[in-house]
Amino acid sequence: MKNFIKSMTTLVETLQALDQVINHEQTILCSGRVNGAALQHITEQKSSLLATVDYLDKQRRQHDERLKQSAPYSRQPEIAAMWKEVVQLTTKLSQINRHNGMLLGKQIAYNTEALAILNASQTQKFYGPNGQETVTGQTVRKISV
């Protein structure tokens, strides 16, 4: 039983750490100028924490099978309180992560539009001082045969 309580405590602590990371991610995404390196670091942190959560949840389910118990653990008040916190945190994290996904989608769309504008201006045809068409500073000569 002590191992189960320890696993549940670690699960709650890991979810709290994930909450901080996801909130930091949201701050970066809302800042207007997204720092790609910082976002990459956060993605790595999230992946690591989610792998830990998955491992701890598997341990929890194994303990449940062995001890013939199941969530919400109403017969064990200490564990029931931790389970309630796990449910609340996962609900909150899911909502924030969904919102961050929308923010990230908007940032990707913005970057895609900016790249399209930049690429279009590079292929735009102009006339040089000699009257010939130029493409981004290169003279294009038409030869008739």
Task: Indicate residue ranges for each PLM-predicted region.
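Extended, charge-rich alpha-helical scaffolding segments
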Residues: K2-Q69, Y73, A81
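Short terminal interaction segments
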Residues: I79-V145
